[in-house]
Design a protein with these regions (language model features):
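Elongated, amphipathic alpha-helical interaction scaffolds
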Residues: 1-261
Length: 261
């Protein structure tokens, strides 16, 4: 799709909607999993855990606007682990680097007020990096991304392992992928039903109409019903922003490919 087509599609009304939506820091995914009960269910589903007390989960997501470019959707500590969850509708080869920058700030925050020059070891939770991918570009069911893939040389330890490594597990949650995960976490399954509903209507309708129609259909069918009834206006505005951003990202990639970049 050319830039001209995208601009024509946007229009003044779309620009106004986009401006409104940009005021929200949340994403639909983050809104859903701001509920500790739902977040614990997702954690148990993806990790194989069997935790039962949502209050044992401590949400530690960084909120500072300056870190929005490297943000993750939700970070939380449970037992001895720090989990960083991110939902992505586009493929990001730099996710390990983004997570490195983010977790460094997270560790700095967790260690605040403690003497890092002390002979006593400062204990830190073991980090886990999970990306939930639901974009249109074909991806495998599971993909491990490594920070070392970005290294220009192999200047590593004697055993051949990098001196600094970070692994991100990307889980494809599109229809037909990781169905067992979604079976164990009904909210994740219904989230993808909503996303697919918007995409289906978006093919034949203006984006706002597609989102509003999808919201009403999901409410009728009991898909995220309570959440959509409670957060309807915010979900509509946020969805417009998210799907506009998804279109923008795809357009930039297509134009780069056409230009031979």
């Amino acid at each position: 799709m050319t830039k001209q087509v995208v601009e024509e599609r946007s229009g003044q009304g779309r620009a106004a909607e986009h401006a409104v939506a940009r005021n929200y820091k949340d994403t639909i995914f983050r809104m859903l999993y701001s509920d500790k009960k739902e977040l614990l269910m997702l954690y148990n589903a993806e990790s194989g855990g069997n935790y039962t007390e949502p209050e044992e989960l401590e949400v530690v997501t960084l909120e500072q606007a300056i870190y929005m470019s490297m943000k993750n959707d939700v970070s939380f500590i449970l037992d001895t682990s720090l989990s960083l969850y991110e939902q992505q509708s586009t493929v990001c080869a730099n996710m390990p680097l983004r997570d490195l920058m983010y977790v460094a700030k997270q560790f700095e925050t967790l260690a605040a007020g403690r003497d890092i020059h002390s002979s006593r070891l400062i204990r830190l939770p073991s980090p886990r990096f999970i990306t939930f991918y639901n974009g249109k570009r074909e991806q495998p069911e599971r993909l491990e991304q490594r920070l070392s893939d970005a290294y220009c040389g192999r200047g590593s330890a004697a055993d051949g392992e990098p001196n600094l490594e970070l692994r991100v597990l990307q889980l494809n949650i599109n229809p037909g992928y990781n169905e067992e995960l979604k079976r164990k976490c009904p909210t994740l399954f219904q989230y993808m039903q909503y996303v697919e509903c918007v995409r289906r209507y978006e093919r034949d309708m203006p984006l706002r109409e597609a989102v509003e129609t999808a919201v009403e259909e999901c409410i009728r069918k009991g898909i995220l019903r309570d959440f959509l009834l409670r957060e309807k206006a915010k979900v509509i505005n946020m969805s417009i922003f998210e799907f506009d951003q998804e279109l923008h990202d795809r357009t930039i990639r297509n134009e780069s490919w056409e230009d031979g970049v």
